[in-house]
């Protein structure tokens, strides 16, 4: 899940991601959050994780904004950007957003 603390649509989507995570974490669903915050945004990024209740363990950011290495690898040019990755490690769905739970159920 690519996001940033300054991204209002990302922050608005976070409660839904948290809800789906809490519902399916015991069935093999996990979230890997990649923040596109800037170098001077580390404190805001960490605060947003707490404020939004992003309780999963996987949070990373190189604090390089749009020059983020993971964003380049995944071709991310806008956020929020979510990838559902299947059990074989292949990208199954890109940006399911409101359809997240339904798409996830197809993979579990």
Placement of each model-derived feature along the sequence:
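Flexible loop/turn segments at secondary-structure boundaries
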Residues: 6-9, 38-42, 67-69, 91-92, ...
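A short, structure-level motif marking secondary-structure boundaries and short turns
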Residues: 5-6, 31, 52, 96
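Structural microenvironment flanking redox-active thiols in thiol-disulfide oxidoreductases
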Residues: 12-52, 65-71
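Thiol-/selenol-based redox modules, centered on thioredoxin-like
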Residues: 78-108
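Short beta-strand segments
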Residues: 1, 31-35, 60
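Small/polar loops that bind or transfer phosphate-bearing groups
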Residues: 2, 62, 96
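Short, internal strand/loop/helix patches
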Residues: 46-83, 87
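Short active-site neighborhood of thiol/selenol oxidoreductases, capturing the structured segment around
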Residues: 1-11, 17
């Amino acid at each position: 899940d690519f996001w940033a603390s300054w991204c209002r649509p990302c922050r608005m989507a976070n409660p839904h991601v948290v809800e789906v995570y809490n519902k399916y974490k015991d069935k093999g669903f996990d979230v890997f959050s990649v923040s596109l915050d800037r170098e001077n945004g580390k404190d805001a990024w960490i605060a947003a994780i707490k404020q939004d209740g992003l309780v999963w363990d996987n949070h990373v950011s190189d604090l390089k904004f749009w020059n983020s290495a993971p964003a380049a690898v995944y071709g991310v040019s806008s956020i929020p950007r979510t990838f559902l990755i299947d059990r074989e490690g292949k990208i199954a769905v890109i940006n399911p957003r409101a359809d997240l739970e339904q798409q996830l159920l197809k993979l579990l």
